[in-house]
């Protein structure tokens, strides 16, 4: 009787870990996409500033 609940608990913990890992992976992917977008925005800002400087000269 004791063995059944413990194995059930172990399975539950493993499933929970799997869920946490998949959520973490999704979070990291979303974070990478956000960083890429931010870098693109920064790049376009820098390029427009550079063209402004060149047009002033």
From Swiss-Prot:
Protein origin, superkingdom: Viruses
InterPro entries, sorted: IBV_3A (IPR005214)
A UniProt-annotated Pfam family: IBV_3A
One GO BP: symbiont-mediated suppression of host innate immune response
Disulfide bonds: none
Signal peptide as annotated in the record: 1-23
Sorted UniProt keywords: Host-virus interaction, Inhibition of host innate immune response by virus, Interferon antiviral system evasion, Signal, Viral immunoevasion
Function: Involved in resistance to IFN.
UniProt name for this protein: Non-structural protein 3a
Organism: Avian infectious bronchitis virus (strain Beaudette) (IBV)
């Amino acid at each position: 009787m004791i063995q059944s609940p413990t194995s059930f608990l172990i399975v539950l913990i493993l499933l929970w870990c799997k869920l946490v890992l998949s959520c973490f992976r999704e979070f990291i992917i979303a974070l990478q996409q956000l960083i890429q977008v931010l870098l693109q925005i920064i790049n376009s800002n820098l390029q427009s500033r550079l063209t402004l400087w060149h047009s002033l000269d």
